[in-house]
Amino acid sequence: MRRIFIPVVAAALALPAAAENISPELSLILQGQYRRGKNVPERAITGYWPAGHAHAVSRRLTLDETELIAAAQLGWSSRAQLNLALHDGKIEVEEGWLQTLGLGHGFTLKGGRFLSGIGYLNEQHPHAWDFADAPLMTKALFGEHYGQDGLQLKWVAPTGLFMEFGAELGRGRGFPGSERKGAGALFAHLGDDVGRSHAWRAGLSWLSTRAKEREAHFEDTDAAGPNEVAGLFTGKSRTVVADFVWKWAPEGNPQQRNFKFQTELFRRSEGGDLACASDVATSPCLGGVALGGLRSRQTGGYAQAVWQFMPQWRVGYRYDWLNADSKRYDPATVFAALDPANATFARYRPQRHSVMADWSHSEFSRLRLQFARDKSMQGVTDKQVTLQYVMSLGAHGAHKF
């Protein structure tokens, strides 16, 4: 699907500016940070299957993810957008999609690569976050966010109460699924104003995907080792996310003062088969070994509040928690090959407290200082300090509610 949609988006954005009813927009988002914390060689949330690799914290000023965004309104009927993320010398297509605007009756259809509409935070890029990093919930569920290569159909009801319903079908390339196994998502959002100063939005989302040999690093029980081996999970993954946001601004004007409360809760259930593989001759995982069934249930969430107490200045607090993962497997079979001390098998309740203060010179720049007490790794209390800047150059669309 990537071969079909992304070239189409790129071609659409390359149309001459003189074409009728086309208004191209270009923007560049620069992000940099200095972060100080414990030097942990390979970070992982204890008790949870790692969503990719997280390496040691860089203790110097670094250029973080840079975003290049190109968008265009293609007449009255459609819109195209391309988001490129540049980080550590690599370029990734985060989004590249075409969206219809003229289906009528509140319907829109989007095709290509896009951030899924599940939950609240998932559709937001890092520069739009209220904190310098993603919640533990997001990291455990998706790594950073969940993207689809596929189609999204959305309907906004023609009512006074905001009612949005959506369905997605994609190839499921992102964690917790794996390449080309397919994924489907459903979501519903409701919202309204309360008087002139308050507004709210609530949502419920469901994601279903499949994994084939989803990989993580483990240590085996080789007496001559231990060796690092690949743990492989093949099976189904189902995630339910509930979200709620409340905003306050005096008389609906957020320029002087405003307040935002935001929370999301999740439950993920997985079921399938576990295996391990190694090329070390003495490893019990040599050549690939089946370790039987694996069932798990995970829950958790986060809650945060951000208060703009005067123009340009904000403060915020966030609490993250993940409940101990409930797993069902045959210990005799699994631990004959894998070390039971592996962090993925631990019963532990990760949590983190974060406070931040930021100053915005204008809507195009922000400087943020954040402190966090991170206990997402068992036996490690990581006191983190982050100094971050975010700068936007060029036209940039308004952020969502």
Set out the residue ranges of the language-model regions.
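Sec-dependent signal peptide recognition
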Residues: 2-8
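N-terminal signal peptide c-region/cleavage motif recognized by signal peptidases
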Residues: 14-17
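Outer membrane beta-barrel
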Residues: 20-196, 299, 304-327
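Outer-membrane beta-barrel pore domains
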Residues: 54-55, 97, 122, 130, ...
